Swiss-Prot record:
HEAT repeat placement: 458-502, 981-1020, 1162-1200, 1336-1374, 1618-1656, 1662-1700
Protein name, UniProt field: Proteasome activator complex subunit 4B
Organism: Danio rerio
Gene: psme4b
Comment block on domains: The bromodomain-like (BRDL) region specifically recognizes and binds acetylated histones.
Gene3D superfamilies: Leucine-rich Repeat Variant
GO molecular function list: lysine-acetylated histone binding; peptidase activator activity; proteasome binding
Keywords: Cytoplasm, DNA damage, DNA repair, Nucleus, Proteasome, Repeat
Region (Bromodomain-like (BRDL)): 1632-1720
């Protein structure tokens, strides 16, 4: 086969779509594909060489993607590589229009998709062009200013593209050099760098190249990940990178040292709730890991010699198992379910890759690390428990069903039996339908694994019959969801099983195994099953007839639910009959025939269901079925219509309708079998098509449609699970061997129905007989020669439409001359013709054209004479749509079938073995879909005059009087616009005519219709926004001008809404349109390689030289033209805006359009600049806002480039950089930091300094070339009025004009929305641009305003001056020293004034102002500002509030400077320390936040030297010495608040309490912000916090206690390094000996959270586990009851998450404690008091009982082997003294509550004696005893 094909093709295809070989016309496809490929290669290569990106290259790349959909990668490897290289060149053309770039990128992704087809040797692509493209779009410097408009989808397209590219082996090192310098953890660049590493770093390399691959970065990244504790945003990216690395290099990366840490972090990432009251750090929720990558990572680490990951995975699942129980719910549940669903799928994928996949160039997994059978078993065992619980989850059973499907593929014997155990009882129960739906949906997924049985699970198939029989009661008319899942269940199982009675084989054959004999005898029940199923269906139908389910008045259509049941019923019944043997089929046929013919059904609901069942029967075996049905129905109909009057009756007899309906459905069968009955059928059609009754003739039309369709279409006729059916005798073929057998793609033996000559003749005979006369009548009517009533017209149209639908596949498409002159192109833009199995007969009349002609005449006649006949218009619109697009199937039907095909495929596929092992019916369906796809592919159709006429008719209908007609016509129009090449250019001007203001004859309906035509629908073309200058230049000005049209009225809300939607859609969908269409030489060269390639030889060769010259000339002309069109569009819009009569709405729309036209590669024309600058002072706020944004963008366009030069950091610092990596504060980057003794205070210092503006340079490592700005002498001079361009002069004139500025400042200091306004970055950009481009030219005019504003303390004025100042400081980046000095001399006093007026409304704006001003600026440039801010944050002059605000502002500035101002941070800290004992809460909170930022730089990251900024350790020591009085004292710490004017120095203790309150604020603030947690320092404070924190959850506590509790909660959730755990445990042990029981109680709650959040890290050290265990057991014997109970709860939790095991030593310890003897109670006097202190013995005895109780409660959902004995032990204490009795009762009632659901299962674990005792215990004691 392959050889012959290679001979025809001339090459070996890379990978083609196999389904094409099964089409009935497969033998023609090789030649066809070669023709198309030669066409694509010739034209694409030619278009590239002629440099015609649009339409040439775009048109032919689209054809290439269509080719991929039709044939797969059916080209030689050489062509494949050429296509990829060419597209890569095209994608990376700089300045390429974004929509073209996306279209090329999507195709490129498709070509790169199957990695195994091209190895590294075949193809390497450079990574830098892609990186430049990605950077320019995702981190665009101009997008935020509105100079570039990118679509939302572009990010994902580019990411996918980057992931699919192969890069050379040297790339890893180059990438590290490029992005390492960005790794500054305090900066946003960190996120960017790690994001780039995740996307770009290559991980698929052969092992010998690993040294040039991941080994270069693995340790560095891994150490970074391990050392970060507080989940910054980029941690997730690292996880994604590691997951990809693990998956691509199984066995080559040693994960073992990291495994406990990895699993601890994964567990933390689920954010599960632990303990009682828990504070959640918000970033833990937003930055948590992506489950898909977590799953990939876990599944790649399993296996290997130790298989450590499996042990941890067991731990992970046992620790979270109870969260899967259906009674638990929360926002974490979705994540856990995703984990459950994806993990088995990922393991299956890995097994497939290791065991079944064809080897290719990608390195295989080394055999030492492949998953062994034991590994798989262990994995399945670990997942079984959670999956079985999740089956009944609140989120539905889908996730569990998918998990079970994959687990059953690997180990059916482990997972199927427990699910069956749940399924059988669920089928019996009537009260819990939810259980039935859940178990059935899980069984459906496991059906194939159950049936194929295999050596591990041979007893699987025996369950089929019992399951099927018991499922029958589920067909229940009263429970919809149960009914549907039952249908699905039955259909799934019967598709896989031939329903053949094989019991007779027991006597004939003696070579059967035991299992086969059992199946043979069971198969005798099949007949019974089929008949019972039918009875159930009949009952269902009887109860859903119209009379039963509707009131008289209600609708007669089927409801949505009924139509679903109908679908379920008919497809299930059809599946059953397909799989039946002939004997069973005959019985079933008899039964359904009797049911259908002895009753009369109404045709709407019940009738449809019965007819469907009959159709199913006749589809399976047409000959047998038609023999019964056709004569019966025909006789009945002939008999009932014998009377003349019948044809004129309005309401027909029910029996007649029912027989018609039945007949119309049973004829949907193999056309060949219909031919014997053709005379009868034609006779019936002639009788019934002219019935008066609408219901009657509609059914007759259906009959006509189905008869034609059955004979004219190509379709498969059998869907049986085994080719050839089951009719062979049992001696030679035993069907039970085929249970669950997949279809064999290579021997599918599809039986196709291809119309024979006889059938074709019959089709045309029917058309001549029935269609011809209708067309003639309609034509006479349209010419006014014959009267027809509306009903008659409608009836005729109905017949025409159904003839088209039936015979559409035989009628050749409309043809004619092409519409030319729409688009100039030097490349051939022809359409590709696909062969779809029909040879059109040119000798017969082409009815498509005839219908087309008559319909157009009729349409014009109706629109002229009776436009209100909307029903006929609807019919005509439908017919026009079918004339254009219908070749035998509809697009929407195809789409929904494709969807359902993928769903069924998913639910039944075998991902483990792969190789398309689907069931036969599914494969046949897929082949049919391939055929239909070929029929429906209409991309790139030529636009012919016929189409032009039809489109114009549709446009006329789209702008007609009635809204329903308009909307139906518009939908057809939009589909057509997307089908024909360039037809939009022809139609758009016609639509715009309706909007022309000069026309007075346009009605409102036409106006609205035209607007809707421009708007488009949500998925089609939007005419108002085609990405093309010609179209936009027409539509945008027309939309604006339509505001002057007489038909436009703003009183009509519908019209106003339309304009809003239009403007909104244009804004949403606009993408910057290209101006520069240059094609680079590399691409041209590749184009030549394509036209010169062979196999297949391109059908046209390389263009001649003169053509190439012409191409170059055309390209240059095109670029010029684009610029002219752009300028003209701007000019047109400005002209519209000049019109005084234009309503305000349209003015705003026009300005909106103008603002979309700003670009970064071509300056805005001067008149538009003038317009926007003037609009800054427009009356309308909306316009002012648009103008501010636009002017900021214009200033960016006018920005003059600055010269940069490379410098060598070592020359400046005088230090040579060390060989290995050293990050952080080191001698080599000391010169970047702020040193107050060497600041640039004079002109020469300023010029000598090397300023580095960006904060991240130099922290981690230096870039290869550090670029800094050249000295001032080499930079361009400041702008002088005589050297300005026109645009610059316009801005200059306005901003030096005092009246303009006056007005502007007035507007800018108005408030917009009270209390909602914030510092506005747009305005900041405006001022920054002004001062950057014109240096200090505008200061003189602005100064007086700024001084005035700064003195006014109103919110909006302060905000305005803050925006100006921020812009001014950032804009002064390149000013000369003199100007800068003068600037600060003016600004410093001004800011002092402003900051002294600070208020609660404005402090945030001032913070933003300073932060913005300091962002990306060298601190040595800003020393004036920083020193001013440092002066007086806590002077106390303005009261506590002003102090807090000053601190906030200062913090904004210093935080932006990160690690470069250690000196200032030290100064600030020494300044704050004495003031930490603040009284006011707001100041304390602010100080806490500032401290966080001061210590932020003190991080413990790998390769990082200790910082010069303040260290936490030293600070904590100083604090602790001041807190001594609190730590040493024993009395309770109260919140002392002393009056302000308290005399004298307060005592040490009060000072300490005030200090502590501030320290708590600092601890809380830093929990979510810093990178690493200072654990050793926190531990020193722990004892103090435990002392204060209250036990109950009560909000009435004072601030100090609440804060202490919060701090404990946050600390306990912290991630600990392994070496820190023993330190924490030591402190907890110490506190457990404290005298305060509150502290001892809190130790337990702290321990719960800490252990769970560091589970695997603690488990990896035996010593720590023992430490925790000892601590809990010690506190179980605490003298305080509350502490004992909490210890029991904690122990139970640890047992439940498998942190501690229930071993014999623990059990004996508790049993011993329980036996502690209690002292005898002495007889007392009645009046005396009991002793309140419990005796030591009682405590010990209680501890033992609590221990047992904890063990019992730790297994809430199952009964382990040790449980019964413990329950017996416990019951002995039921009558002990309190508190023991109470504990026992509580435990027993909890046990009863949690085990009640599955008590039947759990009962099995107990002996009879134990059950007797237990029943006594659990039944409430009798109250009358």
């Amino acid at each position: 086969m392959k050889k012959e094909q290679a001979e025809i093709l001339g090459f070996v295809p890379q990978k083609e779509i196999v389904y094409n070989k099964l089409l009935p016309y497969a033998d023609q496809l090789d030649r066809e594909s070669n023709d198309i490929l030669a066409q694509i290669k010739g034209n694409l290569g030619r278009a590239v060489q002629l440099r015609e990106l649009w339409p040439g290259v775009l048109f032919w790349t689209r054809k290439l993607s269509t080719y991929l959909r039709l044939y797969g990668r059916k080209f030689s490897k050489e062509d494949h590589v050429l296509f990829i290289k060419l597209l890569y060149e095209l994608v990376t053309i700089p300045k390429l229009e974004i929509s073209m770039m996306q279209s090329f990128a999507r195709l490129l992704v498709n070509l790169l998709k199957k990695k195994e087809l091209l190895s590294r040797d075949d193809l390497e692509l450079p990574w830098r062009p892609l990186y430049d493209l990605y950077e320019s779009i995702l981190y665009s410097k101009t997008e935020h200013l509105g100079l570039n408009w990118f679509p939302n989808s572009v990010e994902n397209v580019l990411k996918t593209l980057v992931k699919s590219c192969r890069v050379p082996e040297s790339a890893t090192q180059e990438m590290l050099d490029e992005w390492r310098p960005l790794l500054c953890p305090f900066d946003v660049t960190m996120q960017k760098a790690i994001g780039y590493f995740e996307l770009f770093l290559p991980t698929i390399m052969p092992p010998e190249q690993h040294d040039k691959g991941f080994k270069l970065w693995f340790d560095e990244m891994m150490n970074l990940w391990v050392s970060v504790q507080n989940l910054p945003a980029w941690e997730g990216n690292l996880v994604n990178l590691f997951a990809r690395l693990a998956n691509d290099n199984i066995g080559y990366v040693n994960w073992d040292p990291y495994i406990p840490k990895i699993f601890t972090r994964i567990l933390r990432s689920f954010n599960l709730p632990v303990g009682t009251s828990q504070m959640v750090v918000p970033r833990y929720l937003t930055n948590s890991y992506d489950i898909g990558h977590v799953v990939l990572w876990i599944s790649s680490m399993l296996g290997g010699p130790q298989n450590q990951s499996q042990k941890q995975l067991n731990g992970l699942f046992s620790s979270i198992a109870s969260f899967y129980h259906p009674s638990n719910n929360g926002r974490w549940l979705m994540k856990l379910m995703k984990l459950l669903q994806r993990l088995p799928a990922s393991i299956v994928r890995r097994l497939h890759r290791e065991r079944y996949k064809k080897p290719c160039w990608i390195t295989p997994v080394p055999s030492t690390h492949k998953l062994t059978d034991q590994d798989v078993t262990d994995f399945v065992e670990s997942m079984k428990q959670p999956v079985l619980m999740a089956m009944f989850s609140k989120t539905g059973s889908m996730d569990a069903a998918q998990a079970l499907q994959n687990l059953a593929l690997m180990r059916p014997e482990l997972v199927i039996p427990p699910v069956l155990e749940k399924t059988y009882p669920a089928m019996e129960t009537l009260t819990e339908p939810h259980q039935l739906t859940a178990t059935l949906s899980c069984m459906i997924g496991m059906a194939r694994s159950l049936l194929s049985g295999g050596r591990h699970y041979p007893e699987g198939p025996a369950h089929v019959l019992p399951l099927l029989m018991r499922a029958l009661p589920g067909v229940d008319p009263n429970d919809f969801s149960k009914c549907m899942i039952t249908f699905q269940f039955i259909a799934t199982f019967t598709t896989l099983v031939p329903l053949v009675d094989c019991s007779s084989a027991l006597h004939d054959k003696n070579d059967l195994t035991e299992m086969e004999r059992e199946l043979c005898s069971a198969s005798a029940e099949f007949e019974d099953f089929v008949l019972q199923f039918m009875d159930r269906c009949f009952a269902l139908i009887d109860s859903s007839t119209l009379e039963q389910t509707r009131e008289e008045t209600e609708t007669e259509k089927m409801t949505h639910l009924e139509s679903l049941v109908e679908l379920g019923l008919s497809s299930t019944f059809s599946t059953i009959l397909t799989q039946c043997s002939m004997e069973i089929f005959k019985v079933a046929l008899e039964k359904v025939f009797n049911f259908a013919t002895t009753n009369i059904f109404e045709t709407r609901v019940a009738g449809r269901m019965v007819a469907d069942m009959c159709r199913a029967a006749s589809k399976c075996h047409p000959a047998e079925s038609l023999r019964l049905f056709v004569p019966h129905c025909c006789n009945a109909i002939t008999h009932l219509t014998a009377n003349e009057d019948v044809s004129n009756e309005e309401e027909l007899d029910k029996e007649l309708l029912w027989n018609l309906q039945l007949l119309s459905e049973v004829t949907r069968v193999d056309g060949e079998k219909l031919l014997p009955y053709r005379t009868q059928l034609v006779q019936i059609l002639q009788l019934t098509l002219r019935l008066r009754c609408k219901q009657g003739y509609s059914l007759a039309c259906n009959l006509l449609h189905h008869v034609l369709r059955s004979t004219a279409l190509i379709y498969p006729t059998d869907y049986c699970s085994v080719p050839g059916g089951f009719s062979r005798p049992l001696q030679e073929y035993l069907p039970i061997k085929d249970w669950g057998r997949p279809g064999d793609l290579w021997n599918l033996e599809i039986q196709w129905h291809v119309p024979s000559t006889e059938e074709t003749a019959f089709v045309f005979y029917v058309l001549d007989l029935l269609l011809q006369p209708e067309l003639q009548r309609l034509q006479r009517y349209a010419q006014g020669e014959q009267e027809m009533s509306r009903d008659d017209v409608l009836q005729s149209l109905c017949i025409v439409q159904h003839c088209l639908l039936g015979a559409g596949s035989m009628l050749p498409p409309l043809d004619g001359s092409t519409v030319t002159g729409l688009v100039p192109s030097m490349v051939n833009l022809e359409e590709t013709k696909l062969y779809i199995g029909v040879d059109y007969d040119q000798s017969r009349e082409n009815y498509r054209e005839a219908v087309c002609k008559v319909m157009r005449q009729l349409l014009h006649y109706i629109l002229e004479h009776s436009e209100d006949d909307t029903k006929s218009l609807f019919a005509i619109i439908k017919i026009i749509s079918d004339l254009m697009h219908f070749k035998g199937s509809h697009k929407h039907e195809f789409d929904s079938r494709w969807k359902s095909f993928t769903l069924v495929k998913k639910s039944m596929e075998n991902r483990l073995h792969g190789k398309k092992q689907h069931i036969r019916a599914l494969l046949i369906d897929r082949v049919l879909l391939q055929h239909e796809m070929r029929k429906l592919l209409v991309e790139g159709c030529e636009y012919k005059t016929v189409h032009q006429d039809l489109l114009r008719d549709l446009l006329r209908l789209s702008t007609s009087t009635y809204s329903q007609v308009r909307s139906k016509a518009q939908n057809v129009l939009f589909t057509a616009l997307g089908t024909y090449n360039f037809c939009c250019r022809d139609i758009t001007p016609r639509v715009l005519e309706f909007l022309e203001p000069t026309r007075t004859d346009v009605t409102q309906q036409q106006f609205k219709g035209a607007l809707y035509c421009l708007l488009g629908n949500h998925c089609g073309v939007c005419l108002a926004n085609l990405h093309d200058w010609d179209c936009i230049a027409q539509t945008w000005p027309a939309i604006v001008r339509s505001g002057l049209s007489s038909a436009m009225s703003l009183e009509k809300p519908s019209i106003v809404r339309l304009f809003d939607d239009l403007a909104d859609k244009v804004h949403r969908q606009y993408e910057t349109i290209g101006i520069d269409f240059t094609v680079p030489e590399n691409a041209v060269f590749l184009g030549r390689s394509i036209t010169n390639s062979s196999q297949p030889t391109p059908h046209m060769g390389t263009p001649e030289d003169q053509e190439l010259q012409q191409g170059l000339a055309v390209q240059q002309a095109k670029n010029r033209e684009a610029e002219q069109k752009y300028e003209k569009l701007v000019k047109d819009l400005l002209e519209c805006l000049d019109d005084r009569d234009l309503p305000w709405k349209f003015e705003h729309i026009a300005i909106g359009f103008l603002s979309l036209l700003l670009r970064d590669d071509y300056p805005l024309p001067a008149p538009a600049v003038f317009f926007f600058v003037q609009s800054l002072n427009h009356d309308a706020l909306v316009v002012r806002k648009m103008a501010i944004a636009a002017v900021a963008g214009i200033l960016k366009q006018l920005k003059r480039p600055r010269k940069k030069i490379p410098v060598n950091p070592c020359d400046i610092s005088g230090v040579t950089e060390p060989e290995e990596l050293e990050a952080g504060d080191r001698p080599g980057n000391d010169w970047l930091q702020y040193h107050s003794e060497s600041l640039p205070n004079s002109q020469q210092d300023w010029d000598a300094f090397c300023f580095v503006e960006k904060t991240h340079w130099g922290y981690y490592s230096w870039p290869k070339k550090l670029m800094v700005y050249a000295p001032a002498a080499e930079q361009p001079k400041d702008l002088a009025p005589d050297t300005m361009s026109e645009r610059e002069a316009i801005i200059n004139d306005h901003f030096t004009d005092p009246t303009f500025i006056n007005q502007l400042i007035k507007f800018l200091s108005l408030e917009d929305r009270k209390g909602k306004d914030k510092f506005n970055p747009r305005r900041f950009c405006l001022f920054k641009g002004l001062f950057r481009n014109y240096s200090d030219a505008f200061l003189p005019v602005l100064k007086p305003h700024m001084e005035r504003l700064a003195n006014d303390s109103h919110e909006s004025t302060q905000r305005c001056v803050a925006e100006i100042i921020a812009g001014l400081i950032r804009g002064s980046k390149h000013w000369s020293f003199g100007k800068v000095e003068a600037l600060w001399a003016f600004l410093i006093p001004l800011m002092r004034t402003a900051l002294s007026n600070i208020t609660v409304e404005t402090y945030a704006d001032w913070g933003t102002c300073v932060a913005t001003a300091c962002e990306s600026r060298d601190p040595r440039k800003l020393h004036w500002l920083l020193e001013m801010l440092m002066e007086c944050p806590l002077s106390g002059e303005g009261g506590s509030f002003v102090d807090a605000c000053h601190l906030y502002v200062l913090q904004g500035g210093l935080a932006q400077q990160e690690w470069r101002v250690p000196e200032l941070l030290h100064r600030l800290l020494s300044y704050l320390e004495p003031k930490l004992t603040q009284v006011y809460k707001n100041v304390r909170e602010r100080i806490g936040s500032v401290l966080t930022y001061i210590f932020m730089i003190d991080v413990a990251l790998p390769y990082t030297l200790p910082t010069k900024s303040p260290h936490i350790a030293e600070f904590t020591e100083r604090i602790l010495s001041q807190l001594k009085p609190l730590i040493e004292g024993d009395e309770e710490i109260q919140n002392h608040v002393v009056e302000e004017n308290g005399v004298g120095e307060q005592d040490e203790r009060t000072q300490a309490i005030k200090l502590l309150k501030t320290v708590l604020k600092w601890l809380m603030a830093s929990a979510g912000r810093s990178f690493s947690t200072p654990v050793p320092q926190q531990l020193q404070l722990l004892p103090l916090l435990f002392k204060i924190a209250p036990v109950e959850n009560d909000d009435s506590y004072d601030e100090l206690k609440r804060d202490a509790k919060t701090c404990l909660s946050l600390m306990s959730q912290g991630l600990l390094y392994p070496e820190q755990i023993p330190m924490v445990l030591a402190v907890l042990h110490e506190i457990a000996g404290s005298s305060s029981w509150h502290a001892r109680y809190s130790v337990l709650t702290y321990l719960q959270t800490m252990v769970f959040y560091n589970l695997f890290t603690i488990l990896s050290s035996e010593q720590c586990v023992q430490g925790v265990r000892a601590l809990v057991i010690r506190l179980l014997e605490d003298e305080q009851l509350e502490v004992r109970e909490m210890a029991a709860t904690t122990l139970s939790g640890f047992l439940q998450c498998n942190f501690l095991a229930m071993d014999s030593s623990m059990q004996t310890h508790f049993e011993a404690l329980c036996k502690t003897r209690l002292p005898k109670k002495r007889k007392r006097d009645v009046g005396s008091v009991m002793d309140t202190i419990p005796s030591v013995d009682l405590v010990r005895r209680h501890a033992g009982v609590l221990g047992l109780s904890a063990c019992i409660l730790s297994s809430p959902y199952d009964v382990p082997t040790w449980m019964p004995q413990l329950l017996m032990d416990l019951s002995a204490h039921l009558n002990d003294t309190q508190p023991i009795e109470m504990t026992v009762k509580k435990t027993l009632s909890n046990f009863r509550r949690t085990h009640h659901d599955n008590w039947l299962e759990h009962k099995q674990q107990f002996t009879d004696d134990q059950l007797v005792v237990l029943t006594d215990l659990l039944v409430s004691p009798c109250y009358y005893a």
